[in-house]
A protein has these predicted regions:
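Short, mixed-charge, low-aromatic patches
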Residues: 12-18, 38-43, 73-79, 135-142, ...
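Active-site beta->alpha N-cap acidic-glycine motif
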Residues: 23-109, 113, 117-127, 131-132, ...
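Alpha-helix termini
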Residues: 11, 15, 60, 79, ...
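Terminal accessory/targeting
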Residues: 1-44, 60-69, 191-228
């Protein structure tokens, strides 16, 4: 009888320990986003801003449609436009790191150069908003980078996120709003979790013109809009 009680007690202890460890793992290793979950959601992400000619109009559309987005900023541009950065933040959007200079040859010259660029961009956000973030997007994405560059970012404690859909506003010069909409609609290929790449750098008026249609399409498809 005593042995049975001991065995039961040990099993209960082991179960509790496993649950505790699993909970710790979930907390420490929570992904930026996860695919394969049941609810459909979309993350609108804007790179290369802020700009005077695009970002305020993007913000107007987002406000009108009642959705939030994530802005991967260029530090050099943010230094010149702190009021736009403050507006993005006050509107409830996420502000995260893209690059300080966005000069590929310069920032990808070495791991040290890349980290210096990231830290400079982070410092700009902190100086304007008092905001610290560890979320980053490689200019051009991480897909074709040397592994040592990706590794150095992870070792420095930054999380990075790419995208799995794009409106292709940086790929197709002069693309019409309808072309951008079709790309944003078709490239996700029925994914339940969509990280959509758009740009709010200078002279992206067609991106602004396509945005409302993109948002309304995904609302009709039952997607929830989230920030990273």
């Amino acid at each position: 009888m005593k042995r049975k009680i001991v065995r039961i007690g040990f099993c209960m202890f082991l179960t509790a320990l496993l649950l505790f460890c699993y909970g710790r793992y979930q907390t420490l290793h929570k992904p930026v986003f996860a695919f394969g979950q049941e609810n459909k959601c979309i993350y609108l992400t804007f790179d290369d801003g802020p700009s005077d000619s695009t970002t305020p109009y993007i913000l107007d559309v987002l406000r009108e449609e009642g959705v939030h987005a994530t802005f991967f900023i260029i530090g050099r541009q943010a230094e010149l436009r702190p009021a736009i950065i403050e507006r993005i933040y006050q509107s409830g959007h996420a502000l995260v790191i893209h690059s300080y200079s966005h000069e590929y040859a310069e920032i990808y010259a070495s791991p040290a150069a890349l980290l210096e660029d990231i830290k400079k961009c982070s410092a700009v956000l902190e100086s304007i908003l008092g905001l610290e973030t560890d979320l980053y997007r490689f200019p051009g994405g991480s897909y074709s980078l040397r592994q040592e560059l990706v590794d150095c970012v992870k070792k420095a404690g930054y999380r990075y996120v790419d995208w799995n859909a794009s409106c292709r506003d940086a790929e197709i010069p002069g693309a019409s709003p309808d072309e951008l909409f079709r790309a944003a609609r078709d490239t996700p290929a029925d994914r339940s979790r969509i990280v959509l790449l758009l740009h709010d750098g200078a002279h992206r008026q067609n991106t602004v013109a396509a945005l409302k249609k993109i948002i309304r399409y995904y609302k009709e498809q039952g997607y929830e809009f989230r920030t990273l």
